[in-house]
Amino acid sequence: MLFHSLIMGLVEGITEFLPISSTGHLILTGDLLGFLDKEKRDVYEIFIQLGAMLAVVWEYRRKIGHTVAGAVRPGGERNLLLGIVIAFIPAAVAGLLFSKQIKAVLFNPVCVAIAFIVGGLIILWAEKREHKVAVETVDDLSLKDALKVGLCQCLALIPGTSRSGATIIGGLFLGLSRKAATEFSFFLGIPTLGAASLYSLIKHRDALSADDIGVFAVGFIASFVFAFLAIRALLRFISTHSFAVFAWYRIAFGLIVLGTWWSGLVNWSA
């Protein structure tokens, strides 16, 4: 069980901030491993999401500290913090209204695979468009564009879409540089993952057990470490590459899942 927890934490850490859908990978990996029952897995995912979120906080601790200090100081710069808050609201509202229905209908391997493929095609389309940069850094992002990125994040309620993918590609469409779109996606992930984890923790508090501390701790640590590494690797990668490689990965992986499901080669649950 601890080894499976390590694998799940690794998957969350690597995929949370890449445009390839952490939720989709967790659904597929959890089903393949037969990892925990549904309620226990929901609780477990709270802890690995927190691990990934804290990796962003640690990587950008100086930037976050500077941003918060500027926001509370009289006459200080509040634009970035306000932008994050405004961008967070649409997905928070949509999640409260529709997450239960979406989970009941779409949280299965086939729907995830289809979303993988569709998302990959959208990324390829976005990369083929002429990309005119109007916003070089996250500090230059207008509140109007922040809201638009937040609306894009609502698409991530569909498993397999990717929260990072929706916000980064949405940012590119709005004229953000690759670095600005990626970093704003990172920052937006802090309240999004934090709120989702808190909501799930309250909802599933009765499923918490001291017997699971070891399993949860392994997943949390693995998620933190690999998310930290993935964040740094992605920032280096996008300085010289497009997101097309992630698109082709999504398409190929989605086709493999559909093929193994259709052929019966892999007995996907759900």
Curated annotation (Swiss-Prot):
Membrane topology: Multi-pass membrane protein
InterPro entries: UppP
Subcellular localization, as worded in the UniProt entry: Cell inner membrane
Main location: membrane
Protein name in the entry: Undecaprenyl-diphosphatase 1
A GO term, aspect molecular function: undecaprenyl-diphosphatase activity
Protein's UniProt keywords contain Cell inner membrane: yes
NCBIfam families per record: PRK00281.1-2 (NF001389), PRK00281.1-4 (NF001390), undec_PP_bacA (TIGR00753)
CC per GO annotation: plasma membrane
Note: Bacitracin is thought to be involved in the inhibition of peptidoglycan synthesis by sequestering undecaprenyl diphosphate, thereby reducing the pool of lipid carrier available.
Highest taxon of source: Bacteria
EC identifiers of the protein: 3.6.1.27
Gene: uppP1
Family of this protein: Belongs to the UppP family.
Pfam families named in the record: BacA
Keywords from the UniProt entry: Antibiotic resistance, Cell inner membrane, Cell membrane, Cell shape, Cell wall biogenesis/degradation, Hydrolase, Membrane, Peptidoglycan synthesis, Transmembrane, Transmembrane helix
